[in-house]
Amino acid sequence: MSNSDYAKDVLVSADWVESHLDEFQSDDPAYRLVEVDVDTEAYDESHAPGAIGFNWESQLQDQTTRDVLTKEDFEDLLGSHGISEDSTVVLYGDNSNWFAAYTYWQFKYYGHENVHLMNGGRDYWVDNDYPTTDEIPSFPEQDYSAKGPFEDIRAYRDDVEKAVDKGLPLVDVRSPEEFSGEILAPPGLQETAQRGGHIPGASNISWAATVNDDGTFKSADELRDLYADQGIEGDESTIAYCRIGERSSIAWFALHELLGYENVTNYDGSWTEWGNLVGAPVEKGN
């Protein structure tokens, strides 16, 4: 299913997905394919046959608290879309799997075992002329029972404060302009902060450095070298963050899942939380 050089068998190729389209379109919940985008505009136009569409903005986070879904809401979302806790779920999405990686992380937070990312995401599927449809699938509801939450893959503000005090690795995956404080957020995006800059001691290793031009992940050796160049080799607790937790999910996936560095967490509060805190330490510049 995946490159055997990676620590875990968590990636599937577009070819593998294409060869299992019959299973993904079946009422049997053994296999489910899910496209996760920032919204469902692209999904509504076309998607892989059998793919369920999740809207990251409205379905994958609490609309009041900007937190991850509660266990009950997570169970309702998956069960209502025909996903059971035993389903083999393949996730893919726009922006080289930003939001699919965040959803993968949330699946793991609630203990779903058989979940994978499709390497390359939506753009790879479309650009390489794999089959698409505009038909929205409907599957029999399932009684989904989540586990966890498993807090060992999630970082909170207190964890970040302790990491800063101890000088532990922090990976800021935002653009150099965001990292330096030149801009607060990528152009056109609304979630922002009162201050620009980065968490003291953080290394700026862009999420884009983990993927090839076609959106597929770089090899295990390339990823290992990328992080080792910044002193991150898996021997210390490491926290990844971005602006709202979706781009940092790519770094968490690369470090924790592909390289097998177990002590890696995703700070989903990210800069939108830290940059709005009164009195929190901030560094500017590169």
From Swiss-Prot:
Matches recorded under InterPro entries: Rhodanese-like_dom, Rhodanese-like_dom_sf, Thiosulfate_sulfurtransferase, Thiosulphate_STrfase_CS
UniProt keyword annotations, A-Z: Isopeptide bond, Repeat, Transferase, Ubl conjugation
EC identifiers of the protein: 2.8.1.1
Gene Ontology MF terms: thiosulfate-cyanide sulfurtransferase activity
Pfam families registered for this protein in UniProt: Rhodanese
Disulfide pairings: none
Catalytic activity: thiosulfate + hydrogen cyanide = thiocyanate + sulfite + 2 H(+)
EC category: transferase
Glycyl lysine isopeptide (Lys-Gly) (interchain with G-Cter in SAMP2) cross-link, renumbered residues: 162, 166
Active site location: 242 (cysteine persulfide intermediate)
Segments forming domain Rhodanese: 27-134, 164-283
Gene3D superfamilies in the record: Rhodanese-like domain
Role of this protein: May be a sulfotransferase involved in the formation of thiosulfate.
Record's protein name: Putative thiosulfate sulfurtransferase
Organism: Haloferax volcanii (strain ATCC 29605 / DSM 3757 / JCM 8879 / NBRC 14742 / NCIMB 2012 / VKM B-1768 / DS2) (Halobacterium volcanii)
